[in-house]
């Protein structure tokens, strides 16, 4: 879609965001990032836009871009196709690593707003939305992944957070259970946060069931935090200092898995 809409800078931010947000779920601070860009015939404009995005993503995350690899491989890639990859190294104090073991029933789930689709679910987007509609709304559909590093690391210094999940591929149903303690499940309350219209476009255009939407997309929640009920408003207030919108969207219950109702 980025190629079709000729919007490349956001891809670099997406690449960094997917890495640093994953590291953040452990309570770790990203230190440095490296990228890999491979293409059949080097396109200077495209490469510059992508690298600008990677640099911007690293700036937002507060980590260093220390190097990377640019490979021109004619004959291996179709005209215009390219590969983009990267990895990040972070650090955390061993005794402060967030592993979900302190999660227990009665705690609440705070959801932090996403910027939109982020980086997952685009196979379905391409399937259900018309190309002309995508191009018309490209800025909204291709809005880069939100990077949560600075607000969440600041929060961890102030408030108790027992688990963090980055809502990526697999949506709520796959990402939340793996950060919960044994014997704990999550109950998510639909309607407890505003769902961006881009998800309504997808659901209505493709006649997609609600459960499938929550299994595929972030539905407006890019990251969830588990904390004590009595601290939830403090958590939300602290995040608001970084202009992050957040809501109590559910609670931890006895059992397993995730229910969205």
Regions found by a protein language model. Name each.
Residues 37-38, 116, 230, 253:
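Short, glycine/serine-rich, charged loops/turns that create anion-binding
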Residues 22-29, 66-71, 100-104, 122-125, ...:
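Low-complexity, flexible helical/coil segments
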Residues 37, 100, 120, 236-239:
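Short amphipathic alpha-helical leader/targeting segments
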Residues 14, 29, 69-70, 92, ...:
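Gly/Ser/Thr-rich beta-alpha loop segments that engage phosphate groups in nucleotides
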